């Protein structure tokens, strides 16, 4: 998994940067690894908090609050969906007004507050319903947590989502601001920073699902969440203490404003007549993006009403809320061109979300003994993270060099082909999950036997392998194909696919629960048919894959693509191709 700045364009040199006093930065005292290293702590802590909560929350909701499996899954996926969606808000606020430093600092403080509230919510006994004994649980007589008891939990979760979204969308961009890309030495350091950035995420995630989940299950939720809160508080303090060491950049405005403005003006002028020739559109002669006939309705945003009055026309052109330029209109068209691929990426994250909900609950109905040690249900997700790390390494050392020789392309296979491979892995994961769940249920119902929870490893492995391809492919696709002046929204588009994936999971669970009269997704999985739900995801995944292929084969890649490859010794190789393959070629997928 490779992480890229959420908010920077094609080139950001140190000449645009300033220190905390507003003066040109001294490279020997600001930025570089000195500043970036302090910033990494914020992302490390965010991962510890979010992964420690999301990967084990469903067991608390079902086991302690006596909430149904379907409702518990919906709570978790809505939380994760909101967190990623609020990443768009965090990116917008940073780009439009606050800047990345202020946004990360505020978000870290908000996240710390949210985890403190969660610690309180899970520690106070009055925030939980009465303990349910085995007899009541067997006969579905457990008292479910009421609205009053859930209120503080919801406030805590969505406070964390608000803060986590702000960190997620800005911390990598703020880290990259510490390097001057016009300096070859610092540009190389920035690429190395992204490697270390991902390493921090991996370390934080593994610590959360192994150590914190164990503490939550065996010592107490309060202790587990308390450690997360303390970690976030320390990270916020360290971030603030390093203020004098950072390089800052002024907000340049959000590209979402441009998209909204073009859409608004096109609608406002919808009754206007098209000019006799596109050259009469505002800014046609100075456009940096060639005019196209695609989505011609948007061209109306660039129609000037005062062609006969040069002074009035000049006034209009200075106010972007009166008339847009051809460049702005064409940039919005390029973004709209990405929507079909964006939409067909959503279901991958819907499948991924099952690893944080029903797969964790499956583990609670299986034999988790490892000798005398009982592995916490949420800790099995460590296999997901380890698989992602494994395949990321294999991609760099084996897969990319091999496919380069086979396809004669600098990056091995195209970004859309990477996404396609990830989608196939996700379908395979759900098919395997369905088979394993059927075997688990039959053993429990017919033989009163629990099969080993390590049978869940294959589905974690397949989803992890899929993420290694799909994550990189999606992020690479949006970064490459977004307009040059709208690169800052690349991560925003990517985060929105993750967000929508979790929300679609919530919607799907609700629909299935209603259509099947709650027979597929019961709290007692031995009386449920979770395997049917997994097979449904396989079918939906197959249909989505076919639609993806249709759109991918029609997609035309942008010209003049720069490929950046980080080798094992952290050296940087750049390769430029005049034109990517213009379509998604099935024959190139290994």
UniProtKB/Swiss-Prot annotation:
The chain crosses the membrane at residues 48-68, 73-93, 104-124, 147-167, 197-217, 222-242, 332-352, 371-391, 419-439, 453-473, 492-512, 533-553. GO terms for molecular function: symporter activity. InterPro entries: MFS_trans_sf, POT_fam. Low-affinity nitrate transporter. This is Protein NRT1/ PTR FAMILY 6.4. One of its GO terms (cellular component) is cytosol. Expressed in leaves, flowers and siliques. Detected in leaves. Belongs to the major facilitator superfamily. Proton-dependent oligopeptide transporter (POT/PTR) (TC 2.A.17) family. It is a multi-pass membrane protein. Keywords: Membrane, Nitrate assimilation, Symport, Transmembrane, Transmembrane helix, Transport. SUPFAM superfamilies: MFS general substrate transporter (SSF103473). Induction: Up-regulated in the shoots by nitrate, but down-regulated in the roots. It is found in: Membrane. One of its GO terms (biological process) is nitrate assimilation. Gene3D superfamilies: MFS general substrate transporter like domains. It comes from Arabidopsis thaliana. The keyword Transport applies. Residues 1-24 are annotated as: Disordered.
